Each structure stands twice: as structure tokens, then as C-alpha cells.
């Protein structure tokens, strides 16, 4: 598979947020992956030396090592604390998102900065209540889909970046068949 047809996301862990450690962490990620660049690189949590880590990812992006840079788990309060001090606005904020947890306040803030919300747990971490929600199952039955497909379609229509995970081939195919 050609490299330009594969999207690679990696994260920097909290213990690497000091500036010099952050620079090393980026290089370590590139080396372990055997890549010249990473498509999206995220800070895993908005705690600790966020400003130092962000400076390192901004520099790595300028150097062409990181195509896009973002943050994970940043609440509205933390977004407003950190992002105004960044030179480069994050392209992505990866947070929990599903029909039970729609992050409306955060989405409004991100929209103002033209930032994409990327959902982890887009299917509610397998929450049986969500997958058996009567409104969702009724829509699924009406359109000949399963509850997971309805949820992923909803999130796609809301312009949420989703990446449901599965090791089951049938489920992976089902997750792609949402249109």
C-alpha cells in the first residue's frame, strides 16, 4: 500500500511534555514507525508542560515531520486556557463523543476556530444501552442497518471524525457501510 494512502496518527504521552523530551518523543515515534512524517500527532492530555510540548510539535510540523497537530481530551475550559497562547491552532481535538455525550459546548468553541472534533468511543465503548436505544434501533430497522451503523452515520453527518475499532472483519465492513 503506498504511504500516501495510509493515515497514521500517533500521540505524545504526558511524561514527555518537557520541551527536550517532547522533541525526543516525536523522533522516537517516527523511528519506531519507520516513517519520514506522521499525518496527525496529538498531545494525549492537556496537563503538565502543555506549552513546551506544543512548541515542540509546532516546530516538528514546520520541519515537515508532522502534517497535522492536535490535542486530546481538551475540555472547553482547558481549550480557552491553552489554545489562545499557541502559535498554531490544533487541527483536531480528540475527545469522547457519542449520541449520549455530544459535547455541544466544545463543538461550538471548536467550530469558531475551524477545528475538527475526532471521536474516541464513537459507539459509546460498546455501551449496551446506547446500542439498544429505542430511537436508534427504530432507525436501524427502518433503513436495514444495525445500531452501530446508524450511530456512525449520525456522527458523520455531524462532521465528527470517527474511528471505531474492531478486530472482526464483518464489523469493520459494517462500520464502513453507513451510506
Model regions and ranges:
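Short, acidic/polar
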Residues: 17-33, 52, 77-80, 101-103
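Short loop/turn motifs at secondary-structure junctions
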Residues: 2, 34-37, 65, 89
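N-terminal binding-site loop/beta-alpha segment at the start of enzyme catalytic domains
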Residues: 1-6, 123
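Beta/alpha (TIM)-barrel catalytic core signal, keyed to glycine-rich beta->alpha loops juxtaposed to Asp/Glu
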Residues: 45-179
